[in-house]
Amino acid sequence: MKDSFLFTSESVTEGHPDKMADQISDAVLDYIIERDKKAKVACETLVSNGFCMITGELKTSVYAPMQEIAREVVKKIGYTDALYGFDYRSAAVLNGIGEQSPDINQGVDREDGEIGAGDQGLMFGYACKETETLMPLPIHLAHQLAFALAQKRKDNTLPFLRPDGKSQVSVRYENNKPVSVDTIVISTQHSPEVSQKHLKEAVIEEIVYKVLPKEYLHDNIKFFINPTGKFVIGGPQGDAGLTGRKIIVDTYGGFCPHGGGAFSGKDPSKVDRSAAYAARYVAKNLVASGVCDKATVQLAYAIGVIEPVSIYVNTHNTSKHSSAELEKCVKSVFKLTPKGIIESLDLLRPIYSLTSAYGHFGRELEEFTWEKTNKVEEIKAFFKR
């Protein structure tokens, strides 16, 4: 008997209010880290009806023009007209940034040059063989649909689309392998004059059919395109947005556990971010090396402590090696102290705006060093000893 089930993941466009907040926070981080690699940044953003508030803590000598940074992000996303409910020119931008607590900093920057973890916490990474990027298929497709919504809007293929939008994909699995797409949900902000019939047909033809691989298409896919009907009021006018509210969208679409820490606006001394990238790096290289077909990796840290307090590897019964053997391999091959992660992944660069929409993982951009599979040979060599 086939073991059959549905699994669902969602994504959001760059114009979703929570993603707007993430992008502003990461733009602030990029501006500062480009000018001060030793800066400590924890930037949180709120966007709401007609205003944006930037808050958090900094330790840096760099002056960051918060208004200019925020307005440029909002402009790039596409909120360029008050008719969209938010306009980069007229929105108020409030600055509530403060200084980082010296109590925190004393445990992070050490006299011996090492870096203590910026906080306690647990982080997860995941990889599997469902896609070429070693990501689960549902979140992979959801991101592609959300990205296509934005691209078709920006290139005027679908000029009636507006910036806010969401996608959701339900995939049918048989014996733990994806076999077909069952349901597609897309909600997209739009101009008031377009009919729901035209919008649905255009989204299916220009986005869904051009994104989904042919092997997963069939005549019985269920489509829910703007299922509540009109979606004219969107963005911060429709919902407030906050940094760090899309942590499942940012990671694996619910396919593996999440430690709870968000990424955007945090410099890499914060292990919430850097160790999550490292955990993905470990998991992806384990799968790419062939020692397993899927891997969940957990790392855990204590504030001010250099080494991780625990490393856990679960290959979901797809490896001939034990968890203890895999843990020894990970410790031997990867540098998992905060400093080791920052140096091996070259994280003191202004790369974070690129991560802040459409997923931090599974996108093989040159800047995303944690997506490289350059540890495969070392892993293979470890198990040949």
From Swiss-Prot:
Reactions catalysed, semicolon-separated, are: L-methionine + ATP + H2O = S-adenosyl-L-methionine + phosphate + diphosphate
| Note on how the cofactor is bound | Binds 2 divalent ions per subunit. Binds 1 potassium ion per subunit.
Entry-linked InterPro entries: ADOMET_SYNTHASE_CS, S-AdoMet_synt_C, S-AdoMet_synt_central, S-AdoMet_synt_N, S-AdoMet_synthetase, S-AdoMet_synthetase_sfam
CDD domains tied to this protein: S-AdoMet_synt
Query: Could you say which residues bind L-methionine here?
Result: E57, Q100, D239, K270
Region ranges (Flexible loop): 100-110
Q: Binding positions for Mg(2+)?
A: D18
The catalytic activity of this protein is classed by the Enzyme Commission as 2.5.1.6
What UniProt keywords are attached to this protein's entry?
Answer: ATP-binding, Cytoplasm, Magnesium, Metal-binding, Nucleotide-binding, One-carbon metabolism, Potassium, Transferase
Can you supply one Gene Ontology CC term for this chain's record? cytoplasm
* Annotated localization: Cytoplasm
User: Tell me, what is one Gene Ontology molecular-function annotation carried by this entry?
Assistant: magnesium ion binding
- The UniProt annotation places K(+) binding at E44
Q: Can you tell me which residues bind ATP?
A: H16, D164, G165, K166, K230, F231, D239, R245, K246, A262, K266
Q: Which GO terms describe its biological process?
A: one-carbon metabolic process; S-adenosylmethionine biosynthetic process
- Taxonomically, the superkingdom here is Bacteria
Pathway assigned to this chain's UniProt record: Amino-acid biosynthesis; S-adenosyl-L-methionine biosynthesis; S-adenosyl-L-methionine from L-methionine: step 1/1
Q: Which cofactor does it need?
A: Mg(2+); K(+)
State the NCBIfam families in the record.
metK
Q: What subunit structure does UniProt give?
A: Homotetramer; dimer of dimers.
Function in brief: Catalyzes the formation of S-adenosylmethionine (AdoMet) from methionine and ATP. The overall synthetic reaction is composed of two sequential steps, AdoMet formation and the subsequent tripolyphosphate hydrolysis which occurs prior to release of AdoMet from the enzyme.
Q: Which HAMAP family match?
A: S_AdoMet_synth1
Name the protein family.
Answer: Belongs to the AdoMet synthase family.
What is the name of the protein in this document? S-adenosylmethionine synthase
